């Protein structure tokens, strides 16, 4: 399924710009296949769409050319630079998988790959197993205004049962005029006395029960999404990887048009290596488990991407986590929140930046449940965060608000974890957050600080 240009770019329904394949010395090719040499088969909207978290481009590829090259591993995409002559050696992002039904494509270039305040130049490319072909026409674009961090007045709690290297804080400062209660714990897990661990159990348990199992547990919060049958996503415990992140429904509402559509997607993962150094990446599995420095930019209502691989969405990073667990979305990457709630115009849940295909009861501009998040600061300190929601004292947080709260705490990288009734923080043996709305929920996994 392809996104209609008159929906996503209503202001751009103008005469299309024809991108003529440049096959001369500028592109490093003197000989080109006769079947596509000199053919204008890509049409590009004359303007890029700027959002606070991305630049969006729309183009159309001649279907006959795609079909003629299906045996040559065809790929389309966008490349960009800052000096006006982009080639894939500068920066590029492959587009959706090309099939016999491909044609109009919409491609989102995430702020993870761009810097605020800079002007970029974009052009389309098409390549097969032999050649790379560039369009002559180039489109200018830049990110919109960067969202601002959210800061609160925090009170440090008295926690004599914890090592001095672990601190816990509380706030009841209002969030955008709403009642709000939140807690966070912070520690340097590269220190000599505290480490971070992930727990993944063979039976479902409350966070309280999981904390009580180990007297070395200092602070523990819930972690991954789950079903009754077990934890979802990818986890790493003691260096051993398990699980998968592959494809997801476009919507979990049976009545939604995208309920029966599936999209490959990466999901956010937080973890530490054997030295306790924290990292945040996107993870996906396509025959193996991969970690990436960018999301697969899947777009609901548009053509799906190919499965994650050693090339898509990029070459994997070389990361060997000792403890890690996925959920999502990534809230912060290099200090930038890579999503907002911009809609494509196709209807409810058709978000421009829900790359991780997060369900409607978690991702949305009116969804404010309890939240759990984990992140780390520029100097490597890990922060475990929770907030209450859906109760009189605390009305919860949007995911975009959660990202800016984590940024306000000094985080440069952060991941959202399961929330709602799953959200719990245990400090020592004490539960921090509200438990009146729902009995303590059993969960399959948790993440926290432990004495060494």
Question: Where do the protein language model's features map onto the residues?
Answer:
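Bacterial N-terminal signal peptides that target proteins for export
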Residues: 2-12
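Short acidic-glycine loop/turn motifs at beta-strand connectors
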Residues: 188-191, 271-278, 332-335, 376-380, ...
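Active-site-adjacent helix-turn-beta-strand microarchitecture at beta-sheet edges
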Residues: 230-363
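Conserved, well-ordered active-site substructure
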Residues: 230-260, 351-413, 422-452
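C-terminal motif of bacterial Sec signal peptides marking the signal peptidase cleavage site
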Residues: 20-22
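Zymogen propeptides
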Residues: 146-287
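Short glycine-rich loop/turn motifs
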Residues: 179-184, 267, 326-328, 368-373, ...
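Short, surface-exposed linear motifs at loops/turns and structural transition points
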Residues: 28-145
């Amino acid at each position: 399924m392809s996104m209609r240009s008159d929906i996503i770019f209503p202001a751009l329904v103008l005469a299309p710009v024809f991108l003529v394949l440049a096959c001369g010395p500028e592109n490093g090719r003197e000989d080109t296949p006769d079947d596509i040499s000199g053919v204008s088969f890509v049409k590009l909207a004359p303007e890029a769409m700027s959002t606070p978290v991305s630049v969006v481009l729309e183009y159309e590829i001649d279907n006959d050319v795609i079909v003629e090259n299906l045996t040559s591993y065809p790929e389309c995409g966008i490349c960009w630079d800052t000096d006006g002559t982009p080639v894939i050696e500068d920066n590029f992002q492959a587009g959706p998988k090309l099939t016999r039904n491909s044609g109009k494509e919409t491609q989102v270039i995430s702020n993870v790959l761009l810097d605020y305040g800079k002007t970029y130049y974009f052009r389309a490319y098409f390549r097969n197993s032999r050649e790379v072909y560039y369009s002559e026409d180039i489109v200018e674009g830049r990110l919109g205004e960067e969202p601002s961090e959210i800061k609160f007045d925090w009170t440090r709690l008295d926690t004599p049962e914890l090592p001095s290297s672990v601190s816990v804080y509380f706030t009841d400062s209002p969030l955008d005029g709403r009642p709000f209660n939140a807690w966070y714990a912070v520690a340097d897990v590269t220190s000599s006395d505290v480490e971070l661990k992930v727990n993944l159990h063979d039976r479902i348990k409350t966070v309280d029960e999981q904390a009580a199992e180990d007297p070395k547990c200092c602070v523990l919060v819930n972690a991954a999404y789950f079903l009754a049958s077990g934890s979802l996503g990818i986890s790493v415990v003691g260096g051993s990887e398990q699980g998968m992140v592959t494809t997801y429904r476009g919507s979990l509402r049976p009545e939604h048009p995208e309920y029966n559509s599936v999209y490959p997607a990466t999901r956010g993962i937080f973890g530490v290596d054997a030295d306790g150094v924290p990292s945040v990446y996107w993870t996906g599995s396509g025959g193996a488990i991969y970690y990436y420095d960018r999301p697969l930019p899947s777009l609901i209502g548009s053509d799906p991407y190919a499965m994650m691989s050693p090339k898509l969405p990029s070459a994997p990073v070389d990361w060997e986590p000792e403890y890690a667990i996925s959920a999502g979305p990534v809230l912060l990457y290099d200090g930038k929140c890579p999503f907002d709630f911009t809609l494509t115009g196709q209807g409810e849940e058709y978000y421009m930046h829900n790359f991780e295909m997060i369900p409607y009861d978690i991702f949305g501009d009116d969804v404010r449940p309890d939240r759990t998040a984990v992140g780390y600061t520029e100097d490597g300190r890990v922060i475990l965060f929770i907030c209450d929601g859906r109760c009189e004292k605390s009305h919860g947080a949007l995911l975009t608000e959660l990202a800016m709260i984590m940024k306000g705490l000094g985080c440069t990288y952060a991941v959202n974890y399961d929330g709602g009734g799953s959200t719990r923080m245990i400090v020592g043996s004490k539960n921090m957050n509200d438990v009146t709305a729902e009995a303590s929920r059993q969960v399959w996994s948790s993440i926290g600080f432990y004495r060494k």
